[in-house]
Every structure is written in structure tokens, then in C-alpha cells.
Amino acid sequence: MAARLIAKIVFTSGTVLVRSIQMAYKQALLQAESGMGAAAGSMDVKSKMSPIEARKILGLENVETVSKEDIDKKYNELLTINDPKDGGSEYLQIKISGAKHCLHSALKEGKKI
């Protein structure tokens, strides 16, 4: 009787474990197909990045007045350097894109950056 109960518990636990692994694998595949890696999936689009941090990321902290052209030039330059196909980092590309969007938004709102 006890052996039967233990076998039932082990079988049920194993089934639950296998199903949870399958679901996690399916989610990982969906994220990979949509181009959202772990870093992209965990980043909130509306996460707050200060213009000061964004300037540092793009290497524009020593520039007195930042123009849209300055932002775009540094963005393209850094994105090319950090291309994952050439050994770059997808995480850094996400940070660079976030910095660009932050500074563009600040310029659009008329904030001094």
C-alpha cells in the first residue's frame, strides 16, 4: 500500500516537472523567435533612464549642446561596434538604443540635455 502511494506521488511530481519544463522551453523559443532575448524581455520599454546616463552611454557627456545629429551619429557608430555578429553584446545594443530614445524624447520635450 505504501509503495503504491509513493509511486503515485513520484509519478505525479514527475508529470508536473516535465510539464513546467515544456512550458518554459516553449516560452524561451517564442522569445528567441521574436528577437527578445533575456535582456530585452526583462527591460521595460518605459524604464527611466536619465539624460545624463544616456549621454554617458553614448559618449556625449563632454559635449556642451547635443543635437539630434550627434545622437544619431554616436548611436550608429556604437551599434555597429557592438554588433553581436561581430562578437558584440546584445545587452549593450539595448542600452545604446535606450539612450538614443531617451535623448530624442528629451529633445522633443524641449528639455536641456
Curated annotation (Swiss-Prot):
UniProt entry tagged with the keyword Membrane: yes
Q: What InterPro entries does the record tag this protein with?
A: J_dom_sf, Tim16
Q: How does it sit in the membrane?
A: Peripheral membrane protein
J-like, as annotated region: 56-108
One GO BP on record is:
protein import into mitochondrial matrix
Which top-rank group of organisms is this from?
Eukaryota
Keywords in alphabetical order: Membrane, Mitochondrion, Mitochondrion inner membrane, Protein transport, Translocation, Transport
Protein family per UniProt: Belongs to the TIM16/PAM16 family.
Q: What is known of its domains?
A: The J-like region, although related to the J domain does not have co-chaperone activity.
PANTHER family the record matches: MITOCHONDRIA ASSOCIATED GRANULOCYTE MACROPHAGE CSF SIGNALING MOLECULE, MITOCHONDRIAL IMPORT INNER MEMBRANE TRANSLOCASE SUBUNIT TIM16
Give the protein name, as stated in the record: Mitochondrial import inner membrane translocase subunit tim16
User: What is the species of this protein?
Assistant: Dictyostelium discoideum (Social amoeba)
The record's gene field reads: timm16
